[in-house]
Amino acid sequence: MDGRTRMQIDFARQPPSRVGIEWELACVDRGSGELAGVAPQILRSFPHDDAHPHVTGEFLTNTVEVVSAPHSRVGHAVDDLARLIERVVDVADPLGIDLMCAGTHPFSAWPDQDVTPDNERYATLLDRTRWWGRQMMIWGVHVHVGIEDGSKALPILNALLVHLPRFQALSASSPFWSGQETGYASNRALMFQQLPTAGLPPDLTTWADYERLIGDMTHVGVIDHHSELRWDIRPAPKWGTLETRVFDGVSTLGEIASLAALVQCLVHDLSAALDRGEELPRMQPWFVRENKWRAARYGMDAIIIQDAAGEEALVGDDTRALVERLSPTADALGCEAELRGILDIVDRGASYQRQLRVAEENDGALAPVVTHLVEELRSGLGR
């Protein structure tokens, strides 16, 4: 015996392929475009419970998060988000506050932002991570997809890591940090992984491996609960899902629908492959790390590693082929239109590309970038 502690973690039973979405949004002052710490004031208009769908707060007081209920169809989950956002906008408008979403704010400074008070979880995180934790002025989209058996969680997670650079590049929306162009499509990706419990998951094969890891990490005081692991893709045992968290925040419901459809189709296909007794694809951990960096740095111009053999392709070309392959699955799940929206992102550019174009058209000024992000979100709501 090696003396390691295995912590039994029950994986909730969830109808397969049901999807839920969490969308983090920034509150900005309508006049200046600066971040505004008004989320606590906005949230007073919403009930304080975890019923789905719901609106909640986040780490910083400048952020609200809208959370859908789980649905079999992506479109229904997105409808939840749209209804919630409409309600948030109705509360924020009289305050002179707009909503925007991107992986980072183009120019607001992190020292000026306030951490949500009276939250033990956030206080513990900040006490442990200090300077790096204080800088987490970032926003993302999280997509949950249900799987019916926890034994499938790690094989599917490892197979999803093969697709992580596609997720990263398609959603990349954080080219700026504190008023500077970073040269990265997703500066958020590299910021977030500075936290000791964030970033890529470790190399695990079975649910027992995961339980042993959680037991070890709890035993040595790294975490108190498995929910404190903020991996790019992680099991969510409480909900019976795999949660893809790598996405930068995106500003339109259409893009969210497309990204969610992509994940739903992949999880559905991979789960079916396991049912057929097939071995799922996975890549060497250093390939996964390299792919994440390439996608964060170059976005849609990244040449990504496609498989364990080291074959490479431009992420846009690779993504087009993937969408075509998944089309029958999308048709069966009722999300074919949403999945094909991925091709629109490839054709018109991811958010970081659109932001850079706006900055260039305005001689490098970044206030118009915030205006652009606000308008993208509002236009997606039909406002």
From Swiss-Prot:
Belongs to the glutamate--cysteine ligase type 2 family. YbdK subfamily. It is an enzyme of class 6 (ligase). GO terms for molecular function: ATP binding; glutamate-cysteine ligase activity. GO terms for biological process: modified amino acid biosynthetic process. Its EC number is 6.3.2.2. It holds the Pfam family GCS2. The keyword rRNA processing does not apply. It catalyses: L-cysteine + L-glutamate + ATP = gamma-L-glutamyl-L-cysteine + ADP + phosphate + H(+). The keyword Nucleotide-binding applies. Coiled coil: none annotated. Keywords: ATP-binding, Ligase, Nucleotide-binding. This is Putative glutamate--cysteine ligase 2.
